[in-house]
Structure formats: C-alpha cells, structure tokens
Amino acid sequence: MSEASARIIIDKLLMESGWILPGSNSKVNVDAELTNESGRADYVLMDSKGFPLCIIEAKRGLKSPLDGKEQARGYADALNCRFVLLSNGIQHYQWDLEKGSPFVIDQFPTQSQLQLRQEKFNPSIDEDEDVSNDY
C-alpha cells in the first residue's frame, strides 16, 4: 500500500471522528501538509480556536507507523502539540508526548476528546487560596 492509499484511509477515519478536511464547505479543522521549520507534517489537527492540537504522520502500508515517531515528535515540538497519531492506513497509534509511549487505537480521537485530555493535563486555577497564615 502506498502512502497515498494510506492517506485515503486516514482521511476516512478523520471524517468518521468528526474532523473537517480541506475541500469541505464547513469550517476546516485539519491542515494537510503543513510546512514549518522542522519539515512537512502530513496532517495537523486544530483545536476549536484554530491552534495546532495533534500531528498525524502517515507512512506507506509496508512500513511500521512507529517508523515516523521521531519525525512526528519534531513536528509536534515545533508546533507545540502534545498529541501525535501515527498511521500506515492499517495500524494506528496515538501518542501523548507528555505521558509516555504510543499505544494502538482502532479509531481516531475526536477534537473534543483531545481538547478534554489537554485541559485535564493543564487545569486552570479556579480558586483563590489564602496563604498568609503559616502552617
């Protein structure tokens, strides 16, 4: 399977998870082939405010998706993304750069699932605490 064939499957999985690809009449939340100083990311998934949330690195079917791990980490670091998806169209991995190793997934996460994971990791401070007294 070529990388182009893998991308067709990835596009389908993204749409099934509610992501909006370029060419749609709706507000797009996926950027395909975004180029930055680290190179070209195959896909960048955006959060609801339009900021990069997740990188997808696509490999052709005969290669392990994990072969793109360090390449994807470089793109994620350059775009300040915490999440990476690695796929060859057959196998798919999700990687939370803050929590450890990639793990196998059957479907891609939704925008709201990734945003919720991001927010749980970076909770906002909602309470004022009096720290004037010694303990």
What do the predicted segments below correspond to?
Residues M1-C54, K59-Y135:
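ATP-dependent helicase/translocase motor core
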